[in-house]
Amino acid sequence: MAHKTLIGGTAYALKGGRDLIGGTGYSIKSGKALIGGTAYDIQFAVKVPLNTVEPGAILYLNESGSPVPFYIAKHDYESAANGTGRTLLVRKDCYDLRGFNSVSNGTYLNSALDTWLDGTYPNLLDSSVKTLLGKTTIQFRSSADAGGSPGVYQRTAFQLSTTELGGTQAKSPEGSVLPIADMLHIAYLNGTACAQWTRSVSGYYNPRVDAYIYNYIAWTASGTEGGGTIGAQLGSRPAFTLPGTLEVIQQSDGSYTVAA
């Protein structure tokens, strides 16, 4: 049964028998296999639906052709708006550091960050995954000074809200706290903790947007809710949904890959 196995940081579709890995043919069987002088655990696992995997697990998806880890963050994401069956994926690490917007506008709607996530970023994913993204209904405010409830918008990929991260400083709730919120408070880029944007307008830092700021504390790392100015270079962290019926396979390290 073909599936993806990470070998030396690269995902290979292994069918069993003789497989080509890094230009060399190897005889692959379930169990231990010696590849390039290193022993790997090879298991031909059973395909399972994405929505049966415990939130917090890692799913590897190709980004610009290379495997990147994503948290399986929530099943039936915002089901009142999206219906049942959509699973939220959040990039484990930030993609890069970038400004929220290039003009003095403190809202997410059509900001530089919003435009990049919804328009450019999805094209980095494999076409087979991109076609499954569709549009996800999310909530955010269209104006820093608007009262009442946040608006409802559809996006292919987006930044999380401060509410979803467990924060309380937004003008009003945008969605609900994610079951793995505590795992998302600290964001990293190239192994270094960094601040990450949210799509939320802050009730305390008007017209800024909420950000989770990394604080240096001896021997610990702590994510705290704070504020970020429009041009600050903070972390972009793509999130999107995939069908819960998508078949995935567990690897020997406990992570998952999309079934071939």
Region roles according to the model:
Residues A2, Q43-A260:
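Collagenous Gly-X-Y triple-helix signature in extracellular proteins
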Residues M1-F44:
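Intrinsically disordered, compositionally biased repeat/linker segments
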